[in-house]
């Protein structure tokens, strides 16, 4: 005998929405956010047509146009006859994106040795004896408190910002990699040695191959902290970059520029996260992260 349907059944653990419902529901909160923003903007502009705190759609479009097609205030103006591609290449958004992306990718590349160190701490006992306690202690130091020291050591140029990002994320990534590698059953390592595997084979062909998808997932989760430290460095001492531009626009209440910049940063991080997720699924089809 069938029981009566109850709305709470939709939230059951074993109830799976169809593909159409999944796609529709996934966009619902975005649509709600846009509607709420539009209502708030309309209400504020009724009271003050020149309101800049919650810019209207037209103000946002003008801000996007100024960001994408016009150079920054500190740069020389473009020739009115310049082509569209030339305008984009010399635009404020392009200049800031290239500057921030360069710092971000260099810091991301410098995290590779941190991952390998975490692997070695877990696999090789002497590495663990030397580094584990120090990394545990260093991980508790607030990275932003080291910013004055970094400015003294590296100056206010690129490397102080890059090192802030690395120091802020690397210790946590080292410990995360170490914990993931320690979860590999000891029996597999013993069995590999009985098959005449070398230390290198065990570390990189047995342990690393198993934990690599989880490490990539940890890197994905570290993208936002990396961006946070990048923004902190650029807002304090920089002459270009996405965070630098947001800080400049904040002084002028330029929300028509700030909001598109925030959405652009979120989109870039989302695309990088999607790229890492795609690569992880292609390289390790048996691992299905969120």
What is each of the regions a protein language model found here?
Residues 182, 260-290:
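C-terminal transmembrane helix and the adjacent membrane-cytosol boundary/short C-terminal tail
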Residues 18-46:
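N-terminal signal-anchor transmembrane alpha helix
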Residues 80-120:
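Transmembrane alpha-helix signature in integral membrane proteins
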Residues 131-170, 179-180:
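Generic hydrophobic transmembrane alpha-helix motif, especially the helices
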Residues 172, 176-218, 246:
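Short cytoplasmic-facing helical segments at TM-TM junctions of multi-pass membrane proteins
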Residues 1-29, 276-290:
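Transmembrane alpha-helical segments of polytopic membrane transport and secretion proteins
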Residues 163, 167, 200-233, 260, ...:
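Transmembrane alpha-helices
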Residues 95, 99-103, 152-173, 213, ...:
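Loop-to-helix entry region at the N-terminal start of transmembrane alpha-helices
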């Amino acid at each position: 005998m069938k029981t009566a349907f109850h709305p709470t059944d939709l939230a059951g653990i074993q109830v799976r929405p169809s593909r159409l419902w999944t796609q529709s529901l996934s966009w619902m909160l975005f649509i709600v956010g846009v509607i709420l923003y539009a209502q708030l903007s309309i209400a504020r502009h009724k009271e003050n047509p020149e309101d800049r705190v919650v810019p209207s759609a037209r103000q946002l479009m003008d801000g996007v146009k100024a960001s994408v097609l016009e150079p920054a205030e500190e740069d020389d103006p473009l020739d009115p006859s310049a082509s569209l591609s030339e305008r984009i290449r010399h635009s404020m958004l392009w200049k800031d994106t290239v500057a921030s992306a360069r710092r971000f990718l260099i810091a991301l590349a410098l995290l590779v040795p941190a991952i390998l160190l975490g692997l070695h701490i877990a696999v090789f006992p002497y590495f663990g004896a030397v580094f584990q306690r120090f990394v545990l202690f260093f991980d508790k130091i607030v990275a932003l408190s080291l910013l004055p020291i970094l400015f003294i050591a590296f100056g206010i140029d690129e490397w102080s910002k890059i090192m802030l990002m690395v120091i802020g994320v690397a210790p946590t990534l080292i410990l995360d990699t170490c914990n993931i590698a320690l979860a590999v059953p000891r029996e597999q390592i013993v069995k590999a040695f009985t098959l005449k595997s070398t230390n290198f084979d065990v570390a990189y062909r047995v342990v690393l191959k198993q934990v690599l998808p989880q490490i990539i997932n940890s890197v994905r989760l570290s993208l936002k902290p990396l961006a946070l430290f990048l923004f902190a460095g650029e807002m304090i001492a920089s002459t270009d970059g996405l965070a630098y531009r947001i800080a400049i626009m904040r002084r002028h209440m330029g929300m028509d520029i700030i909001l598109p910049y925030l959405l652009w940063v979120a989109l870039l991080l989302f695309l990088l996260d999607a790229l890492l997720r795609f690569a992880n699924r292609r390289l390790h089809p048996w691992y299905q992260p969120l």
